[in-house]
Amino acid sequence: MLYIRKKMTSMIVKTTPELFKGNGVFRTDHLGENRMVSRSNRLGDGSNRFPRTGTIHCQRLSIAKTGLHRETKARAILSPVSDPAASIAQKRVFTFGKGRSEGNKGMKSLLGGKGANLAEMASIGLSVPPGLTISTEACQQYQIAGKKLPEGLWEEILEGLSFIERDIGASLADPSKPLLLSVRSGAAISMPGMMDTVLNLGLNDQVVVGLAAKSGERFAYDSFRRFLDMFGDVVMGIPHAKFEEKLERMKERKGVKNDTDLSAADLKELVEQYKSVYLEAKGQEFPSDPKKQLELAIEAVFDSWDSPRANKYRSINQITGLKGTAVNIQCMVFGNMGDTSGTGVLFTRNPSTGEKKLYGEFLVNAQGEDVVAGIRTPEDLDTMKRFMPEAYAELVENCNILERHYKDMMDIEFTVQEERLWMLQCRAGKRTGKGAVKIAVDMVGEGLVEKSSAIKMVEPQHLDQLLHPQFHDPSGYREKVVAKGLPASPGAAVGQVVFTAEEAEAWHSQGKTVILVRTETSPDDVGGMHAAEGILTARGGMTSHAAVVARGWGKCCIAGCSEIRVDENHKVLLIGDLTINEGEWISMNGSTGEVILGKQALAPPALSPDLETFMSWADAIRRLKVMANADTPEDAIAARKNGAQGIGLCRTEHMFFGADRIKAVRKMIMAVTTEQRKASLDILLPYQRSDFEGIFRAMDGLPVTIRLLDPPLHEFLPEGDLDNIVHELAEETGVKEDEVLSRIEKLSEVNPMLGFRGCRLGISYPELTEMQARAIFEAAASMQDQGVTVIPEIMVPLVGTPQELGHQVDVIRKVAKKVFAEKGHTVSYKVGTMIEIPRAALIADEIAKEAEFFSFGTNDLTQMTFGYSRDDVGKFLPIYLAKGILQHDPFEVLDQQGVGQLIKMATEKGRAARPSLKVGICGEHGGDPSSVGFFAEAGLDYVSCSPFRVPIARLAAAQVVVA
């Protein structure tokens, strides 16, 4: 079917760096003929674009059957990048073919990732089937036009189609020289399985006869039935299951297991059955006009951009600002032409471990969707090496070329048609956290990338995956292993079994941990996959939909577990004689593929030498310091182990909740007189001092920022029925029940988060601030006596006026003076405040006269700026996100336009009043990568986050520098 109109003979083009100097004259050597060519000349392919330097070995092609066959081995050494077409703003259709293209890898926003990389592969001389890309702007215009092709676009598409037809000497709808097409989507950001694909477009009752005459009946009718299935599902909205049902019945009737065992006559009959599905489902015939098929397929791909599953994937992954999807239309090449054909997907390195070894799968006599969709369980690449050694050797060489060119680990789709290799797609491969770090470190060692580039190769979320738990004792569950599948995404997961995506989401919303068990996953399952702790599938391979999506999210996944049978209707999982019901617990080891009965204990992971090396590079580049929020000595030790440069927030109230301390706290709350309160605080003093000593010891030589008591006092009271609370407090404190009730009523507030808390407690009860300050200074002096370098910083919370801060600073400094007199020596310390009330940000210059440092409490600052109660926001925030009123949860991702501007203003005003002012942030946003970037640009000195998010913040701070 496919052939080249002009045979190309071997040609070598040699260029020099002087090409772009002066007249740009260079020499070509073609079959011994020397010619001088200037930049104004056009190359033989009709292109104005020249390679920069190096050598290209083109290949000789000949016509053979329906495929393109290689007579001389292809090699591509140099890496030219084509200049974008002159009027890109108006151009909506871009063509590409081997050795030439109208696009390049830098045009992803316009051509989508797939289209840009196809153009790039073609331009560097790899064997890419000729095709065209319809731009993302055309998709945007289609949506604006009410889901109609914009004016003039169809004519541009037909012009591009003529390019494909001329290139290969075949025509759409011509039975004597049939051209079949693939129609694929491709957004600027990879979204696996989110968009729809149609293969073998152009077949009808007449064309299939012509194709059969050239390529054999079995191949022709196998291609036709696949097209009917895909076109019906993607374009016409007929469920794939209706076609699958016909196929399964046919295999059952013929007594065969695989599709490949069906004869040509069987497939002919199946084609007619598939046509009847159209009539039954839609009440109309299958559209036989190939150009109408093409138009409908393009519209279907554009429509898929706005499908529920695509919207959900973008929402989950916070993908915004894209124009739409591009459409890639290519000449078909076939992996289902017999035992010398096949299709595969590979990564140039292992995406799970990062090992420098090709990692992928191959199916003999199959089409690409069979591998990617997980419909058939494939074999590893050694199968291809055995059966097609020449094609395999060329594939290995192409992988090396692409890694050198893109300077990254690549995800590649390819097809072999009668021993001829075709490259169908390449993109930067998704990888696990472990894989990302090893690949980055190895590529620096190999000289492929600089350290600054390597830092950009690891996403902050990758480090989050590395900090996920593993099984505590894998040897302890060996007897409970009930099945084993493919280890598609590493890590460990424990949860209750559910069988549908909807159930996974529902159970997750109730606070349950679930394992989603499916025969195979589809893009419609992404919501449930995201909600699940792990994913287990009976079918599919290491590059199936489930595997790719799970790896991208860092979720444990076992695929192709053929020992299990999923009965979704009865909600049971069958493994031999074993039945596991919905809701029962299983565990999964995604690193080994083991499915384990019951709940297994999890343990935190250990940091690898590669990670330590990588993080040392990040630390050397970043300017922003990273501190940790830690409330106990154990937290402080973990923080330091993870690279924290100090404690940015130590919440003293968390020290009060121990069983031996809470009674004293409650006595203090019930106290009526200052003397009663002091008596209770005297009991708490040694506890606080001991905790501070442990934290100072753990953070020897690093600053420790301690926040004075912040929450409303009612949070320390027991929960439950009021009568029971009163009785319990009366027994604990020795206060009469009526007095307890009276005290509780006085503590009751309509809006406690804006009430009696923070510095208001210390101002009303100065003895509370005195006790905490004494505990800090006594602990600091004691540790200093033991040779520990202590750097205490005391932080006053919820300040809204300079007078509030001034009052508390006076109390603290008086206590310090007393303690230092008692101890006979001093300790250097600072007093500062949290900026969490908008008014404090607005008058930061006045606040800075009293404060030696600012720490933005972004949780409360966000709450008060938006007027959203964190405790109640769940009632409406999901609606706001769904309707696009907000793009992100402002309590997770900093609102840079509002809250962010307050932070910038306060920083500038504060430093204007006190140039030495130290400024940081200690809210949850300190661990959010996108927010960390903003804080660095705003000129903050540090961020503080939970101990286990410290590595993520360290990397995010470095990536701001190299962005």
UniProtKB/Swiss-Prot annotation:
GO terms for cellular component: chloroplast; chloroplast stroma; cytosol. PROSITE patterns: PEP_ENZYMES_2, PEP_ENZYMES_PHOS_SITE. Its EC number is 2.7.9.1. Its cofactor is Mg(2+). InterPro entries: ATP_grasp_subdomain_1, PEP-util_enz_mobile_dom, PEP_util_AS, PEP_util_C, PEP_util_CS, Phosphohistidine_dom_sf, PPDK_AMP/ATP-bd, Pyruvate_phosphate_dikinase. Isoform 1 is expressed in leaves, flowers and siliques. Isoform 2 is found in cotyledons, rosette and cauline leaves, petioles, flowers and siliques. The modification Phosphothreonine is found at residue 543. It is found in: Plastid, Chloroplast; Cytoplasm. Changing residue 543 to D: Loss of phosphorylation. Mg(2+) binds at residues 836, 860. Phosphorylation of Thr-543 in the dark inactivates the enzyme. Dephosphorylation upon light stimulation reactivates the enzyme. It catalyses: pyruvate + phosphate + ATP = phosphoenolpyruvate + AMP + diphosphate + H(+). GO terms for biological process: photosynthesis. Residues 1-76 form a transit peptide. The keyword Transferase applies. The active site is at 545 (tele-phosphohistidine intermediate), 922 (proton donor). Formation of phosphoenolpyruvate. May be involved in regulating the flux of carbon into starch and fatty acids of seeds and in the remobilization of nitrogen reserves in senescing leaves. The reaction takes place in three steps, mediated by a phosphocarrier histidine residue located on the surface of the central domain. The two first partial reactions are catalyzed at an active site located on the N-terminal domain, and the third partial reaction is catalyzed at an active site located on the C-terminal domain. For catalytic turnover, the central domain swivels from the concave surface of the N-terminal domain to that of the C-terminal domain. Homotetramer. Interacts with RP1 and RP2. The catalytic core domain alone is sufficient for the binding to PDRP1 but not for the binding to PDRP2. The N-terminal domain contains the ATP/Pi binding site, the central domain the pyrophosphate/phosphate carrier histidine, and the C-terminal domain the pyruvate binding site. This is Pyruvate, phosphate dikinase 1, chloroplastic. The gene is PPDK.
